[in-house]
């Protein structure tokens, strides 16, 4: 896999329309040309439009001659059932969509779905991987995440959850062997940040153990993702992970288990782009904007990359700005 830029290009937010697609395509191509080579998306983002815009951006950047496919790290996710281009107008329309697109085709059953729209069964993952490859226009996806697997714990007990994850990891190892993905991981929201006694807690040590059981010592479970920012510091400060006989932070557990960490919500959906306290500004001198200070905080941590959503050249330039040296 290519050396990864410390800033990653995120594609979560935005309207489900052609204009937003075009903005993401332009910004993504520009980011690749400026050396931002990690792109993060998910099949459910913007009703599959984000994946397709990423594919367009990659093709534009490669055609310009400024980057090769081998220099790009593409990450996507599966778990939440993706819609097609626009959300259904009614609940009945959504049920009809599930029936025709998934249930009738045998991709999954209604019993496989939790929380109204989350699934991690092997047949469903088979389907989603090939859909994502088609959306992205790629033979191989570099990093394939299970999207918020802790969502399952709202509906199943811990024993059943382990079986779900084992089956999912076996499926992903199979797709590594066929060349559809290079590695896999878990992209989470709450799972790695909550207390160990919480119902939706995820144990990184347990996940690595499952990966070793199904994939051996050369398993391809390599990356986890979670929110890490100035306001959400659990990965750095809170010992949420049991490792051996002790408890450690997620970042320490990942380092000791040889798992890469990607930080999401770096700007907390623009909430950290303004009104930061004076002590934060003092801690990151030389930066002219709060957005850049928030990014600098994430980049100061032992992360593989910090993700930031970008849809304009102005935001790209701001996010890449180097600190002034006095």
Segments predicted by a language model, with ranges:
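Generic signal for short, ordered secondary-structure residues
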Residues: 10, 33, 74, 104, ...
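Short charge-dense sequence patches
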Residues: 1-9, 114-125, 241-245
